[in-house]
Amino acid sequence: MDPSKQGTLNRVENSVYRTAFKLRSVQTLCQLDLMDSFLIQQVLWRGRSGESTETSISVQQLFQELRELFQRTGMGNAAQVHPRAPELTLSLLMAMFDRTGSGILKRQPVAAALVALSGDSPLTKYRAFFQLYAEKNRRGDDSQARMTRRVLRALLTDLQQIPTVVGESYTLRPVESAIHSCFRGVLSSGIKEEKFLSWAQSEPLVLLWLPTCYRLSAAETVTHPVRCSVCRTFPIIGLRYHCLKCLDFDICELCFLSGLHKNSHEKSHTVMEECVQMSATENTKLLFRSLRNNLPQKRQRVGAVGRQWLLDQLASRDSASHGPARLCLQYKCPKAPGYASSRRAVETAATGVLCQRPSPALQGNHNRHGQTIVNIKNELWRTRDSLNTLLRERRLLRKQLHRYKQKLQGTYALQEEQNCRFETKIRELTTNQDNLWTKLQQMRRDLQAMLQPLHPSSSPQTTASKIFHSLPDDGIRRGGDSSHIKRVTRDGPEWELLPNSAKVDRKHKCQASSGKALPDSEPQEIILQSTRKQNHPQKMLSKVHSSPSAHQQDTLQIPPTEVKIPAQTLSAGKEMESCSEKRNNLEDEELQALLPRLLDAFDLDSPTGLQPLMDMELYGRAQQVCRAFSVLVDQITLPTWSEEESRLKGPLV
């Protein structure tokens, strides 16, 4: 190292930063920051996985391996490797581990030194240390590797040779304290890798220079857009130190390490080290944190006081040219892969025999803040009471909310039940409506079938016998005037026949008055056909009445003995007459039962409030029924009269 540069670095008050700056200079000079721990292990331990870790190596062999190491580093890195880098590195390693000049070095300390000065993150270096020094079990299982107290002591002792080569020596006492803190609470003889990494990341004092050197290398090109409050430099390049007590107070790296401060800022204030550029949000949070620190604190930072006292004790062991260093520092560095860095104090509290009582000045400062602490505690109790009150109110509101929610759920369930009932009723009513409509259609079909002309299965003898029985016997036997028969046939109330013109005119009047055609009305052709069928028996009757003289002549020519009808023939006629009367009574009953159904069907189709239209429609349908009955009478009367006429003519002949 250049003596002038070394003299400049010796003016740094804090020993940790002084050691880190010196090692950073050596690292840059030898270009060791271009290496990585994986490549170092691959070159130095190539083909020696089964050999002992205590293997020695000569200086010539070490030089060849260093040349190969830098050659492979230059191939994988864009930076140009200096030709003298292997020589400088060999000289550095010999100054560390071969002070007697024997020319023989151990591989394990050499590899640990190269890993410590490489460019990897601290966590990667800690893993490499464990792999180099951990003792494996008899089966050679790497997952069961352990680090014992003896191995950890050897590791820390070898790593202590690195700051010693730059004039920063450490005693053996911090090593024993570090071992005690690492194995605190451990009952076994060794620890696993997770426990070792957790302890190393807590930054023990003996290894504090290693993460500090990494932060210095990471912040060399970082620019902070703030102005130094001491030298007024803008922007700050490198490390930035922000006071957590003073408002908007930033110090550059040079002013902080030189011990330059303003009157408003004291050295006892806690400062935070920034290795990366902070965003506007983080700066705002930092400002609020400073405001919070200016308020009365809950308790005295005894841990910070102890760390400050520890730094004073360490500074007293330095050379006489260095003054006492007092620092309480927090830092923020970039998170390297696998390395979880947090804001914490750079100097951790020492354990074991180094834990002594602080100075009387610090105790007086503690007494001055005693009353303030008591007041803050009282205020804290009042705040807790208020918080408990708020919690009780919160529980009450939650109970009310739960009660209202239950009521709402009950109302919702009731509404759902009512909706289900209504839907069931709607379905039932719809089903009933469909059934009624089906019944109505069936009744319409039945009515249409009954209004059709009578099928041949119905016997016409019933009506004929009834008509024949209703005639006066004396008129037939005496051959009286047939006008009586004609009157009974045409003037009877149930056998009244209408002319074709009257029926057609009445049908047209009904259709014009109702405004719509009847759905079940028969066509006009069927009505005319039925009218023609009615005229046929009328013509036959007129022919019978038109020839009374011939009939009388035939009657006068019959002898008295032949006019008498036998008693057997009369008894058979009476039986036929009684059967016909029974059938007529059954037909009358069927017609009387059909009439109410017909009226009900008409009532279902008729809309409310339209009584005239309903009357006209009912009148039209009644006409259809009358016409159908007329057709039925015509079909029955004609064959009956023909049969009776043949019966009457038989005895006469």
UniProtKB/Swiss-Prot annotation:
Its main location: membrane. Residues 384-411 form a coiled coil. GO terms for cellular component: plasma membrane. The keyword Coiled coil applies. The keyword Coiled coil applies. A zinc finger (ZZ-type) spans 223-279. InterPro entries: EF-hand-dom_pair, EF-hand_dom_typ1, EF-hand_dom_typ2, KCMF1/Dystrophin, Znf_ZZ, Znf_ZZ_sf. Strongly expressed in the nervous and muscular tissues. Keywords: Cell membrane, Coiled coil, Membrane, Metal-binding, Zinc, Zinc-finger. PANTHER family: DYSTROTELIN (PTHR12268:SF18), E3 UBIQUITIN-PROTEIN LIGASE KCMF1 (PTHR12268). This is Dystrotelin. It comes from the Eukaryota. GO terms for molecular function: zinc ion binding. It is found in: Cell membrane. Zn(2+) 2 binds at residues 243, 246, 265, 269. Disulfide bonds: none annotated. Zn(2+) 1 binds at residues 228, 231, 252, 255.
